[in-house]
């Protein structure tokens, strides 16, 4: 029985493929037929008018026989093409397809009869009562308020491998039109019914990764299935199935939010409530009424970065840089992108390179020279001595030259590089060190990030004769207390760290100094001015896509 149904399905597919080929062939033979008729007509016109022989003054009778042969050839070709076109038109396979099946199989609408899917499966799915083994299985429940014409139908070819409950009750057929799942909405407590052939086998299948058994909210008490009745709702692919389930999920979510008693029967996932008025939801609307939170007027220096970098605290600061206050709406997104850029571009490669250098040191017989254990002076000396063997050590030492406590710095760099977006970052403190809390003798996370950011740009900017140490960016664009920037110079454009603990940063631009702000907002203002005022150029280096590639964090703003 199963092999016979499979052969039927294969013959159906072969027929549709043949129809597609014949539809394409009809267009070709019709075009050739019209072309041959046109050529034969032109030659016949010349034969009667004798235009060529008169114009070229040649003997007419030899030319007439040649033209007669060509006219006969083109006429025969035209007759043959029209005969093939008539054959394809009149002897085309008579097959009935629904509009959705015609679209899925690529069969032209003119090549097949349009009919509801029930015409295809009426004779293949006889109605019968469910077997006892089907009792107790969860099946799809459906809304009683929906009309039968809007209920979905699923073919086994679309839901094979999905829900074990459904798969176990489907007939073992390879035909995509053998049986389907449908719903009933005759009364409120009723759910669905199922029809299967008497000899159909039951078999389990693995749960599909997409729908997860067609979602548990559509499962209900033991019930039965019936065959489909409407062609409009015949589902033919997984995308339509997923769209339907998502829409029903949203409807159920709205119903549950409007339910006065979540424990009542009407509020359970099995049932759907669409008949309530707006007044029935008044108590819920009052309960979930939206209320504005109060803003903090003066961020405390002891609070975390989230408070200090709030939108309210940054309004006046950004107002001095740009008049567009709508930019503040993008501040959180810019900050997240910038943190991710620092992590992926600087922190993670730096930690990996440090581990690589430590491994090379051990291979060279210098296990005592390990980054995170040796002093910064020993590392600088080793960078000079081992430069031919480990050329990257000199670059790494510049990133580490911020604190004498190299062990804490190395461990903190590894902690900050974890999580993808520096999730352990603390703007006014750092991490624990050897079981004790962070103290002021250790650098803050803000100081570490600022240092590695400046060092990275030092490596990207070309060397300058005024700064033989190679710190071009740091010397020109970063001033740390107790030093102060020259505000009388209009060309000064730098970041000023006005306080160490807690760390405060100010942006100096065109003789103006912004109010204190957190690290990331100050760096964002610095980069935003470069993008909007300096055309993305920091000196001779492009910070855009063709250079450092950091200005992408602002998008099109």
UniProtKB/Swiss-Prot annotation:
Coiled-coil residue spans: none
Lipid bilayer topology: Multi-pass membrane protein
UniProt entry keywords in alphabetical sequence: Cytoplasm, Glycoprotein, Golgi apparatus, Membrane, Nucleus, Transmembrane, Transmembrane helix
UniProt subcellular location: Membrane; Nucleus envelope; Golgi apparatus; Cytoplasm
GO cellular component annotations of the record: Golgi apparatus; membrane; nuclear envelope
Region (Disordered): 108-156, 194-232
Name of the protein described by the UniProt record: Transmembrane protein 209
Organism name: Xenopus tropicalis (Western clawed frog)
Designated gene of the protein: tmem209
């Amino acid at each position: 029985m199963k092999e016979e149904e499979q052969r039927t399905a294969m013959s159906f597919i072969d027929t549709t493929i043949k129809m597609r080929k014949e539809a394409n062939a009809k267009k070709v033979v019709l075009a050739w037929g019209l072309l041959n008729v046109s050529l034969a007509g032109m030659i016949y016109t010349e034969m009667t008018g004798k235009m060529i022989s008169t114009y070229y003054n040649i003997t007419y009778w030899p030319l007439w026989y040649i033209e007669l042969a060509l006219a006969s050839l083109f006429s025969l070709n035209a007759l043959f093409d029209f005969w093939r076109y008539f054959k394809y038109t009149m002897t085309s396979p008579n097959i009935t397809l629904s509009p959705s099946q015609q679209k899925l199989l690529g069969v032209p609408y003119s090549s097949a009869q349009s009919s509801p899917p029930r015409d295809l499966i009426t004779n293949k799915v006889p109605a019968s009562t469910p077997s006892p083994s089907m009792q107790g299985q969860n099946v799809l429940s459906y809304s009683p308020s929906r009309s039968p014409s809007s209920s979905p139908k699923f073919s086994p070819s679309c839901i094979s491998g999905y829900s074990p409950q459904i798969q176990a009750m489907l007939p073992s057929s390879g035909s995509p039109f053998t049986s389907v799942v449908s719903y009933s909405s005759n009364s409120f407590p009723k759910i669905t019914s199922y029809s299967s052939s008497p000899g159909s086998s039951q078999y389990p299948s693995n749960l599909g990764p997409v729908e997860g058994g067609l979602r548990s909210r559509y499962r209900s008490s033991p019930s039965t299935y019936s065959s489909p009745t409407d062609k409009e709702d015949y589902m033919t692919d997984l995308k339509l199935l997923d769209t339907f389930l998502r829409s029903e999920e949203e409807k159920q979510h709205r119903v549950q939010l409007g339910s006065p008693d979540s424990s009542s029967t009407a509020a359970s996932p099995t049932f759907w409530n669409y008949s309530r008025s707006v007044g029935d939801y008044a108590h819920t609307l009052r309960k979930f009424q939206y209320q504005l939170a109060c803003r903090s007027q003066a961020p405390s220096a002891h609070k975390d970065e989230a408070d200090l970098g709030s939108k309210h605290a940054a309004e006046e600061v950004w107002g001095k840089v740009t008049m567009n206050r709508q930019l503040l709406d993008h501040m959180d997104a810019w900050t997240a992108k910038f943190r991710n850029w620092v992590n992926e571009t600087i922190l993670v490669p730096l930690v990996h390179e440090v581990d690589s250098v430590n491994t090379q040191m051990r291979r060279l017989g210098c296990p005592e020279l390990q980054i995170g254990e040796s002093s910064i002076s020993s590392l600088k000396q080793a960078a000079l001595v081992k430069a031919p063997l480990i050329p990257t050590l000199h670059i790494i030492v510049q990133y580490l030259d911020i604190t004498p406590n190299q062990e804490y710095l190395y461990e903190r760099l590894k902690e900050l590089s974890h999580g993808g977006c520096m999730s352990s970052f603390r703007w006014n403190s750092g991490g624990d060190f050897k079981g004790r809390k962070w103290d002021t003798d250790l650098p803050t996370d803000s100081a570490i990030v600022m240092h590695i950011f400046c060092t990275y740009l030092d490596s990207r900017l070309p060397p300058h004769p005024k700064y033989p140490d190679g710190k071009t960016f740091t010397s020109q664009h970063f001033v740390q207390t107790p030093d102060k920037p020259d505000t009388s110079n209009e060309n000064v454009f730098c970041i000023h760290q006005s306080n160490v603990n807690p760390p405060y940063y100010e942006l100096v631009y065109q003789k103006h100094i912004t109010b204190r702000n957190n690290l990331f907002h100050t760096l964002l203002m610095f980069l935003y001015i470069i993008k909007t005022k300096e055309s993305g150029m920091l000196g001779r280096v492009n910070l855009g896509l063709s250079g450092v590639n950091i200005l992408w964090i602002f998008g099109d703003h």
